Amino acid sequence: MKYKLALVMSVLCAFSAWTEAKVKLPAILSDGMVLQRERPVKIWGNADKGENVTVVFKKKKFSTVAGEDGKWLVELPPMKAGGPFEMTVNDIRLKDILVGDVWLCSGQSNMELTAGRVTDKFAEEIARDENPMIRYVKIPLGNDLHGPKDDLPGADWMSLTKETAPSFSALAYFFAKEMYRETQVPVGIVNSSWGGSSVEAWMSEEALQKFPRQLHERDLFNSDEYRELCNRSGQMMNRFWDTALYKGDRGLHDGICWNRPELDDTDWQTVDMFSKEWGRKNGYPVSGSHWFRQKVNVSAEQAGKEAVLRLGCMVDADSVFVNGISVGNTFYQLSLIHISEPTRPLY
């Protein structure tokens, strides 16, 4: 009995050691990725220290050994555009890899804005797009004041299809299509953007040395305690604002809710929407909620069909009701509401 137990434990220990030695790749090195053509390409990851790592790509082998910190890296030589190819990294198999031009797209909300929010003007184009030679990956939002991250979970590649096109950055979508039209080689878009972010937030500590004030701010945010204090303060202010906005909104508490069609609005003022003064009081803008009501006539032929409501640029958010039914809302300016399949008839 003792002999059998020792044998089983030996096997389990060996299995445990084997599983721990498994090579790991960052999320961005995955199925469907695009590698830069005609330039050396780095492939990297993690494993147990001293682990042998072999990368096989286009029938060529590239080997290395994981260092003391478990990190490893191999460099592929410059390659011509083409694909799709497969790659193996020890026991990991990656499929549908292209070699072409890889572009980093970064910026604020103008780069984050998705193609799905410009379908009003480009609906037919976006709905019919299918190009497996165009790939896209959006880097998930996140920050780390202690240095670059080894991995970014959720950074998954997608091909351009009519289903995925609305998820693309609108700017990157049209850019990628134009680049492919010009070059006829695979195009990979890496979208690392964050609305409202300052350029200093993207700079390294070394790059900030010439900017003392921004460097001081960075040093402050290096403190986990300071960041936690800022987060708590921000959450508290948001709760205060949300509560004050809700309690102070007469449209929600003055008898019949102002989104109801039976509301008597005869004492409401008529507003000149092209005037800059309707949202101001004593020369200053009024922060809070503004309610508008508009009656429109819908023909029998139009009734029951899908429709699009264009409100233009709304700052900062809107909620829309038709005959008392919520048909959509927008957070952040461009308001384009598609009215379809309501829970009950609108007309």
List each model region and its residues.
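Glycine-centered loop-to-beta-strand initiation motif
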Residues: 66-75
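Single conserved hydrophobic/aromatic residue that forms the stacking wall/gate
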Residues: 337-347
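Bacterial Sec-dependent N-terminal signal peptides
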Residues: 1-22
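Short strand-turn-strand beta-turns centered on an Asx-Gly dipeptide
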Residues: 56-59, 90-91, 321-327
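Short, aromatic- and glycine-rich surface loops/edge beta-strands on solvent-exposed regions
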Residues: 82-91
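Non-catalytic, glycine-rich low-complexity segments
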Residues: 21-49, 95-105, 112, 272-283
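Extended carbohydrate-recognition surfaces in non-catalytic/accessory domains of CAZymes
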Residues: 141, 149-156, 160-164, 224-307, ...
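Aromatic-lined ligand-binding clefts that engage carbohydrates, nucleic acids, or primary amines
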Residues: 44, 268, 296-324
